[in-house]
Amino acid sequence: MSEETTVRPERTERSERPERPQYRGNGPRKRRPFQRRKVCRFCADKDLVIDYKDPRVLRSFITERGKIVPRRISGNCSKHQREITEAIKRARNIALIPIASTHVVA
């Protein structure tokens, strides 16, 4: 077999390259609004207790469709999010809160 060598064009320095636009979208660039750091309400208020028998508190951590709100949205710390999840599951098991709030027709 004969070995062929391919000749690559020389790379240009970065300063010689044409500048690319930083934003490659179609419309104007949108800035994200400033979002405050979410604080776990259970860490902030030590008197507030997670109890599976209190559906009023648990409903604020459930969506309209009956799903548990994730930690990044609710702002809970991991310890309290686990406790809330466990309390919601217990309350669902004994029918204090519905598993799905309404029947969803696809």
UniProtKB/Swiss-Prot annotation:
Ranges of compositional bias, category Basic and acidic residues: 1-22
Family the UniProt entry places it in: Belongs to the bacterial ribosomal protein bS18 family.
Taxonomic placement: Bacteria, Pseudomonadati, Thermodesulfobacteriota, Desulfuromonadia, Geobacterales
Descriptive protein name: Small ribosomal subunit protein bS18
Disordered: region residues: 1-34
Species assigned in the record: Geobacter metallireducens (strain ATCC 53774 / DSM 7210 / GS-15)
Highest rank taxon of the organism: Bacteria
GO cellular component, one term: cytosolic small ribosomal subunit
A Pfam family hit: Ribosomal_S18
Keywords of the record: Ribonucleoprotein, Ribosomal protein, RNA-binding, rRNA-binding
Listed HAMAP family: Ribosomal_bS18
GO biological process: translation
Subunit structure: Part of the 30S ribosomal subunit. Forms a tight heterodimer with protein bS6.
GO MF annotations, alphabetized: small ribosomal subunit rRNA binding; structural constituent of ribosome
Stated role: Binds as a heterodimer with protein bS6 to the central domain of the 16S rRNA, where it helps stabilize the platform of the 30S subunit.
